[in-house]
Amino acid sequence: MEKESQTIFDKNVIEFVTVAAEFCAFLERAERMKRSTFVDTSLKILPLLYLKASMLPKCETIGDEALETYVTEEIYEILRINLSGLMADKDDYLVVFVQDMVYSDQPIKKSISEDLADIYQDIKDFIFVFQLGLNETMNDSLAICQENFGTLWGQKLVNTLRALHDVKYNQEEEEEEVGNEEGFYEPSDDNDCCEEDGCHCHDDDCHCHEDGCHCHDDELK
């Protein structure tokens, strides 16, 4: 028991708990954010969460009873729907690093909102039990969270990070291209425009070039 107590109060465990709690709180208030803010913050907190999880000391369960959970189906669905609404048309993405790819030669469609909700469920259940302050259950919740990091939510985190990176940087490129295409009308060179059949700049009584050609003034109005 003493060894388990030392593990749960390890510096790396405390740092992971801190980041994990902030991650959960961040997702819970995400529906009030702009998508750009949500994406930017996610791209910062997800790598940190992965880093802290990878630095956890080895931990094994010591109890036999199932641990309490916090995330119900209703809580999960509310969060997923909120995140899906926030991401809108940028929610879906293609992924190849999933077990189902063994049976398919095509990329599989996943969603950022569902992956984040899955990660949230593991992390929130861990935080809920850990904050109860009972050494044995704290230890076991840490062990389960660590195991699930390796087999479940760690890979989902990496996949989601790639998708969010694509949303942020490819979206900015698309917006820049659209902005360049909009443009505005630029009159032709005076001499070139005066070669058009409808131009009367070369009539004997024409004074167009005293102040520049005005052949296309009507087009600019």
Segments and roles (model prediction):
Residues 67, 95-107, 132, 136:
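Short, charged/polar, low-complexity loop and linker segments
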Residues 11, 15-22, 41-48, 52, ...:
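Charged, amphipathic alpha-helical oligomerization/scaffolding segments
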Residues 3, 107, 122-221:
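Acidic, proline/glycine-rich low-complexity IDRs
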Residues 2, 14-73:
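N-terminal interaction modules that seed assembly of large macromolecular complexes
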Residues 2-14, 221:
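Eukaryotic N-terminal accessory cofactor-binding modules
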